[in-house]
Curated annotation (Swiss-Prot):
Organism encoding this protein: Polaromonas sp. (strain JS666 / ATCC BAA-500)
PANTHER family named among the record's database cross-references: LEXA REPRESSOR, LEXA REPRESSOR-RELATED
Protein name as catalogued: LexA repressor
InterPro entries the record matches: LexA, LexA-like, LexA/Signal_pep-like_sf, LexA_DNA-bd_dom, LexA_repressor, Peptidase_S24_LexA, Peptidase_S24_S26A/B/C, WH-like_DNA-bd_sf
UniProt function note: Represses a number of genes involved in the response to DNA damage (SOS response), including recA and lexA. In the presence of single-stranded DNA, RecA interacts with LexA causing an autocatalytic cleavage which disrupts the DNA-binding part of LexA, leading to derepression of the SOS regulon and eventually DNA repair.
Record's catalysed reaction(s): Hydrolysis of Ala-|-Gly bond in repressor LexA
NCBIfam families, per the entry: lexA
Quaternary data: Homodimer.
Length: 234
């Protein structure tokens, strides 16, 4: 089993999970690492062979009661790993495996606020402050944090005020959550490329898909590789 997905002993003092709960927690972490967003109840049910999404919901509620995750109402992807869960996962890795020292080092991530038109996203004037995290918390090491503004990605569990961990990239696969620059605006959306167009899809029915026509100013700034609740940093 990969050390990045072993939750069998979250912490010597943490909640004891059933085998099924461990499996669901692993699935959640894997989905966030792979796509930048947690799975839906239906996706959990399909992956684990449940007859309905209700069965997945029951297990999620149990994990929430144990304080391992937080459920956000009103969104199909409203599942968040709590800060103490992330910390316990890290402690578990340190305790059970001999990790290289560099994987335990602190990672300095600049927080990008509002981005001025025409300026590089990591220009000094955009950086509000720097946060430090254990690098082993991220399977793909991010380059910076972006403060989320608005609710267009609500159903992916990404809401206003969250901090999105972003890996700089100029290419993306369909379905990945990306940070993109369209003209003077920087936005977080799900990426889809068709034969002639690029579509940036919201995860909220109240918002419209952004269609980028050939020749329009467009630049991919990075891929979402993690999500941090702003309240975790208070």
């Amino acid at each position: 089993m990969s050390i990045l997905n072993d939750f069998s002993h979250l912490s010597s003092e943490g909640p004891k999970l059933t085998a099924r709960q461990q499996q669901i927690l692993e699935l959640i972490q894997s989905a966030i690492t792979r796509t930048g967003a947690p799975p839906t109840r239906a996706e959990i049910a399909n992956e684990l062979g449940f007859k309905s999404a209700n069965a997945a919901e029951e297990h999620l509620q149990a994990l929430a009661r144990k304080g391992v995750i937080e459920l956000v109402s009103g969104t199909s992807r409203g599942i968040r790993l709590r800060s103490d869960t992330l910390r316990s996962i890290h402690e578990s890795r340190v305790k059970q495996f001999s990790l290289p020292l560099q994987s335990l080092a602190q990672l300095a991530l600049p927080l990008v606020g509002r981005v001025a038109a025409g300026s590089p996203i990591l220009a000094q004037e955009h950086i509000e402050q720097t946060y430090y995290f254990e690098s082993s918390l991220f399977q793909r090491q991010p380059d910076y944090l972006l403060k989320v503004r608005g609710m267009s990605m609500r159903d992916a569990g990404i809401i206003d005020g969250d901090l999105l961990a972003v890996k700089q990239a100029k290419e993306a696969r369909n379905g990945q959550i990306v940070v993109a620059r369209i003209g003077d605006e920087v936005t977080v959306k799900r990426f889809r490329r068709t034969k002639h167009l690029i579509e940036l899809l919201p995860e909220n029915p109240d918002f419209k898909t952004i269609v980028v026509e050939p020749g329009e100013p467009f630049e991919l700034e990075g891929l979402a590789v993690g999500l941090i609740r702003n309240t975790m940093l208070i």
